[in-house]
């Protein structure tokens, strides 16, 4: 069975690598030390510190596996290979809802880098799916759970 690929920019991959390093070199040793200290308290069957540290260890090891998988199966997208005015992963796009003055700015990223609170939307999201491949001046219909609406692409820039 083919593994899923994780589409991302080189910057996103480097961010994941830094996060992985943090888990391996800082978080993992901290948890091991907490387990060691909790063991010194004696009877493990009623040792809540030990149980909490073991739970945290499971979380940390899980995060390490997730990050390693995303890095191993990363598919790097080069936004420089796309026309300057074309929406793609690694680009920032400003759109205006047709018939209103409402403007929104989106940074199109791979799923691993999505953070809606920072305006970073996944290339797999309905909005990004509708915008990718379109150019400045295009009007685009977007289907969302809240209903459909149209936007006009005002600008496209490479995300720094």
Curated annotation (Swiss-Prot):
Database matches in SUPFAM superfamilies: FKBP-like (SSF54534), GreA transcript cleavage protein, N-terminal domain (SSF46557)
Disulfide links within the chain: none
Keyword tRNA-binding: no
Coiled-coil portions: 1-72
Molecular-function GO term, any one: DNA binding
Highest taxon of source: Bacteria
Transmembrane segments: none
Nucleotide-binding found in the keyword field: no
BP term (GO), one: DNA-templated transcription elongation
Keywords tagged on the record: Coiled coil, DNA-binding, Transcription, Transcription regulation
InterPro entries in the cross-refs: GreA/GreB_C_sf (IPR036953), TF_GreA/GreB_CS (IPR018151), Tscrpt_elong_fac_GreA (IPR006359), Tscrpt_elong_fac_GreA/B (IPR028624), Tscrpt_elong_fac_GreA/B_C (IPR001437), Tscrpt_elong_fac_GreA/B_fam (IPR023459), Tscrpt_elong_fac_GreA/B_N (IPR022691), Tscrpt_elong_fac_GreA/B_N_sf (IPR036805)
A Pfam cross-reference name: GreA_GreB_N
PANTHER family: TRANSCRIPTION ELONGATION FACTOR GREA
Family, as annotated: Belongs to the GreA/GreB family.
Entry function: Necessary for efficient RNA polymerase transcription elongation past template-encoded arresting sites. The arresting sites in DNA have the property of trapping a certain fraction of elongating RNA polymerases that pass through, resulting in locked ternary complexes. Cleavage of the nascent transcript by cleavage factors such as GreA or GreB allows the resumption of elongation from the new 3'terminus. GreA releases sequences of 2 to 3 nucleotides.
Name of protein: Transcription elongation factor GreA
Organism of this sequence: Streptococcus thermophilus (strain ATCC BAA-491 / LMD-9)
């Amino acid at each position: 069975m083919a593994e899923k690929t994780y589409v991302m920019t080189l910057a996103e991959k480097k961010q994941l690598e830094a996060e992985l390093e943090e888990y391996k070199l800082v978080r993992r040793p901290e948890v091991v030390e907490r387990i060691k200290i909790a063991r010194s308290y004696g009877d493990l069957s009623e040792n809540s510190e030990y149980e909490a540290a073991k739970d945290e260890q499971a979380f940390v090891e899980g995060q390490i596996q997730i990050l390693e998988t995303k890095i191993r199966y990363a598919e790097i997208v080069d936004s420089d290979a796309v026309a300057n005015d074309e929406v793609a992963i690694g680009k920032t796009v400003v759109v205006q809802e047709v018939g209103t003055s409402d403007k929104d700015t989106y940074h199109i990223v791979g799923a691993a880098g999505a953070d809606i609170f920072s305006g970073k939307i996944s290339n797999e999201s309905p909005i990004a799916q509708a915008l990718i491949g379109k150019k400045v001046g295009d009007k685009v219909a977007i289907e969302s759970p809240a209903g459909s609406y149209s936007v006009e692409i005002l600008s496209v820039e490479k995300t720094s």
